[in-house]
């Protein structure tokens, strides 16, 4: 289990493609407060990750603490969003597809 946002994004690019993410082609940017920005390029469920603040189809903001609680399954992404701990801009529908990508 990753210990930090940086470690999470470094590991994400080396994961095998999730069956639920087949057919998903999109770009995401995660802006993690005080830690940095990572851009995920998804092509038919295959993920490439780079540390970048470049434009993306879906942009997600959160603190590192909130992100890691979601990654560890200690908090739901939807619950964090509804509580205002996570903000989303751009194609919000793509944020919902993250479950498929990260499963």
Please identify what each model-predicted range represents.
Residues 1-103:
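Feature captures hydrophobic
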């Amino acid at each position: 289990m990753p210990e930090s946002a940086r470690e999470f994004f470094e590991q994400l690019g080396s994961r095998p493609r999730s069956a639920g993410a087949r057919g998903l082609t999109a770009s995401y940017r995660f802006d993690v407060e005080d830690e940095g920005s990572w851009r995920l390029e998804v092509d038919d469920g295959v993920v490439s990750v780079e540390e970048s603040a470049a434009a993306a189809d879906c942009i997600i903001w959160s603190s590192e603490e909130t992100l890691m609680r979601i990654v560890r399954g200690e908090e739901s992404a939807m619950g964090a969003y509804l509580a205002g701990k996570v903000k989303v801009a751009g194609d919000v529908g793509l944020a919902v597809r993250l479950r498929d990508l990260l499963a």
